[in-house]
Amino acid sequence: ERAYARAVELFEQASSEYDYVLFSLLRQEDRDIDTYLWHFSSKFNFDKVPEPELIEVEDGTGDVLVFERYLFPVTDQDLNALLREIVKADHGGFNYLSSSVLFLSSQDNIIYHCYDDRGVDIAVLDDDKRLELFTDCHDLLFDYDMEEMERRVRG
């Protein structure tokens, strides 16, 4: 419950309006992506599954990983419900959600990534917004992140 509360507080502090959800799934032989897409779009009330963008990434061993990325426009979806499920992903939830969902705000130029109950990453273009988030939410940072964030805020 603490992880969810922290995720929501940071989510709302980062931006008041998210206009896209980017959903990314790794292609694997034993993975039924169509089932995940159906579940994701129906459970979280996305009307239509967009065409995927295929992304190839070479891992540290030289293997090529192929991801399918889907950009869902946000209309009236309950994004807090989606956040709750991401936080629960590793604890009896839908494990395909772990590390696979990004929330995008074009208004605030924010990328918000709650990867699971372990934490949140927020990419911010605006230095003032980064400072505001750091100042208002520094008590939510984990100790091991504090030194790096202080360095980034100082510039």
Language-model regions: role of each:
Residues 1-96:
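Extended, low-hydrophobicity segments enriched in charged/polar residues
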Residues 78, 82, 86, 100-105, ...:
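Extended amphipathic alpha-helical regions
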Residues 103-155:
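Alpha-helical oligomerization segments
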